[in-house]
């Protein structure tokens, strides 16, 4: 059985702004998760064109260890805790496939994202068969809702309910910020529709691990998009050329940090 959920993340930015903001925030967040031999290693980052689709292809390895639950760490041999992430970013559509060489076809996380200029009101944007869509749970993530954030993940400087952008005037986001967006002519909005497929075939552990992965994906999406909004003034003036230069520098920094820095960032919730 494969577990599917669609996470809907509404943001007070435009679809065009988000393209830059997402890439900037991915680079910054990678640094926060890398050190002590763990974290992110960028193997490939290059343009691609296939079957009429154009975009940016990336291949990364995530060295996990402390970022997986203890019960998996105890069972998995050394080297099995590295996962490969391949992403085809044909914005506003993006497809990410995460695999593991040890588990082969028994492990898969697939994240398909459509970025739309709406408030998360569209049904089945990924055009699944009606029978399949019927079994997909839609999960709404509110970046300003403190109750959706684990206490150990909370940082006041990354709280959209407290942040006000100097460059754009957006924020802080109150309890009814999404409803208020509709009446604010000068504030753009968008929704990232993230369809997440999780497959983990390991007798006796399947349900436990699939649910754990979805819990971690939700946590990741929540924390990441809170950061993205609170970093708005750092990226809102950047161009895609700026981003590509920054990605090159980040790749070099990550290689260095993995070797020299201590373990840091999000760890598994045992």
Swiss-Prot record:
InterPro entries: PI_transfer, PI_transfer_N, START-like_dom_sf. It is found in: Cytoplasm; Nucleus. Residues 250-263 have a biased composition (Basic and acidic residues). The keyword Nucleus applies. Transmembrane segments: none annotated. Changing residue 89 to F/L: Significant loss of phosphatidylinositol transfer activity but no effect on phosphatidylcholine transfer activity. Changing residue 94 to A/T: No effect on phosphatidylinositol transfer activity. Resistant to inhibition by N-ethylmaleimide. Phosphatidylinositol transfer activity is inhibited by N-ethylmaleimide. Residues 250-270 are annotated as: Disordered. A 1,2-diacyl-sn-glycero-3-phospho-(1D-myo-inositol) binds at residues 58, 60, 85, 89, 96, 194. Keywords: Acetylation, Cytoplasm, Lipid transport, Lipid-binding, Nucleus, Transport. It catalyses: a 1,2-diacyl-sn-glycero-3-phosphocholine(in) = a 1,2-diacyl-sn-glycero-3-phosphocholine(out); a 1,2-diacyl-sn-glycero-3-phospho-(1D-myo-inositol)(in) = a 1,2-diacyl-sn-glycero-3-phospho-(1D-myo-inositol)(out). Signal peptide: none annotated. Catalyzes the transfer of phosphatidylinositol (PI) and phosphatidylcholine (PC) between membranes. Shows a preference for PI and PC containing shorter saturated or monosaturated acyl chains at the sn-1 and sn-2 positions. Preference order for PC is C16:1 > C16:0 > C18:1 > C18:0 > C20:4 and for PI is C16:1 > C16:0 > C18:1 > C18:0 > C20:4 > C20:3. This is Phosphatidylinositol transfer protein alpha isoform. It comes from Homo sapiens. The gene is PITPNA.
């Amino acid at each position: 059985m494969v577990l599917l959920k669609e996470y809907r993340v509404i943001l007070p930015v435009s679809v065009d702004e988000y393209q830059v903001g997402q890439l900037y925030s991915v680079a910054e967040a990678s640094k926060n998760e890398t050190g002590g031999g763990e974290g992110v290693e960028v193997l490939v980052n290059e343009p691609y064109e296939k079957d009429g689709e154009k975009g940016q292809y990336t291949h990364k390895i995530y060295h996990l260890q402390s970022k997986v639950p203890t019960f998996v760490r105890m069972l998995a041999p050394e080297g099995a805790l590295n996962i490969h992430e391949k992403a085809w970013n044909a914005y506003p559509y993006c497809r990410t496939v995460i695999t593991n060489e040890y588990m082969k076809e028994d492990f898969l996380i697939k994240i398909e994202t459509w970025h739309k200029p709406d408030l998360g009101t569209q049904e089945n944007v990924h055009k699944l068969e009606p029978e399949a869509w019927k079994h997909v749970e839609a999960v709404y993530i509110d970046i300003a809702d403190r109750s959706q954030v684990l206490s150990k993940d909370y940082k006041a400087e990354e709280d959209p309910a407290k942040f006000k952008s100097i460059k754009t005037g957006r924020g802080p986001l109150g309890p009814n910020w999404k409803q208020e967006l509709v009446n604010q002519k000068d504030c753009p909005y968008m929704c990232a529709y993230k369809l997440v497929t999780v497959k983990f075939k390991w007798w006796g552990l399947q349900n436990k691990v699939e649910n754990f992965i979805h819990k971690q994906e939700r946590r990741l999406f929540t924390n990441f998009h809170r950061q993205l909004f609170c970093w708005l003034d750092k990226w809102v003036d950047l161009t895609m050329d700026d981003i590509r230069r920054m990605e090159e520098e980040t790749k070099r920094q990550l290689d260095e940090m993995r070797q020299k820095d201590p373990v840091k960032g999000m760890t598994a919730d045992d």
